[in-house]
Amino acid sequence: YELPNEVWSCWGDTPSFSISPNGKYLAIMRSPREDVCDIEQDKIKGVEDEMTYQSLTFIDLETMQSRVFSDGVGEKSIYGFQWVSDDRFIYRPGLTNAKGRNMNSLVTFAVNVDGSKRKIIGKQEMKGGQGSWTNISVVDRLDADPDHVIVASNERRAFRSDFYKMNIMTGKKKLLAIGFVPKNAKGDRVYGTYRDQEGYPIATLVDESLDRVIYTYDKDTQDWSEHVRFTCQQPSFTPIAATNKGWLVTGSKFSPSGELIEYNDTNALYLYDPETKEFS
């Protein structure tokens, strides 16, 4: 059976799905184009204009009723969707429309699933002379405080984000914690930040040249300090999850006091006390 070359040249639709925290709503984002093989003839574009747009539809999983929030055409395109509660989300309009740049794309909105209570909660601005746009993203929801979420934003420092507690209805933010600043901003790689149940950062993982370093955060002093340092390819451990009571880590086989038991390529799973640096 012969397949025409067009089949191998088509870029099919790639929808994305996101379920609300309580499992009631399914959000579907997809390109507002027919799912057919339509090869863009303009080689500079590469793909059809519609491939850069995203529509947004909600399905109530209890009733299976659907509601189109945006058909995704032109300036109505959706970008940067995130849930902030069971029935509220944030998004940013798409970057372009048929006439050019969509200036609404520089604004982040919060809105209910039914379209009510839409509020501007953030604006993208160029940091003077620093060549970076301000941005905001949700990093944690607070189960004990559903009216607030933890967001990361670089509004204070262009190239490094701090953590804020934000009201999901008003967009009002309160600085919660200072983000980690690497020694070598261009050379060091900073991985994800581990946070406690209140949203405060606990630790972060950083690659510094041939070393991997775990830094911990003191919310009283708002300082980051080196907790432990490992040399590349040497025995080490990495946090998987962290709470105020301890960390779940994976890594080489250590004794409770931290002495290496066995040098091999397999990993063990431990509970780790960062205060005493003991394994259990």
Region annotations inferred by a language model:
Residues 1-280:
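Beta-propeller folds
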